[in-house]
């Protein structure tokens, strides 16, 4: 099963997604964390769920 968690970060309300499976393998899509508080929220979620991030995908670059 694929799990999806999203966060809305920064003054531009950029959505960041963490996708992970039952084996705790995951990817981050469009990390838009802007400050320390937002970075901590993302890191804490990943640590809490014990997700191993295998890739970071940037799909909304200009």
Regions picked out by a protein language model, each given a short descriptive name:
Residues 52-62:
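Metallo-beta-lactamase
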């Amino acid at each position: 099963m694929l799990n999806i968690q999203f966060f809305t970060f920064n003054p531009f309300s950029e959505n960041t997604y963490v996708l992970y499976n039952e084996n705790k393998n995951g990817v981050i899509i469009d990390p838009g964390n802007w400050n320390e508080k937002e970075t901590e929220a993302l890191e804490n979620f990943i640590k809490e769920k014990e997700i191993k991030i295998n890739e970071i995908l940037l799909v909304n670059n200009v």
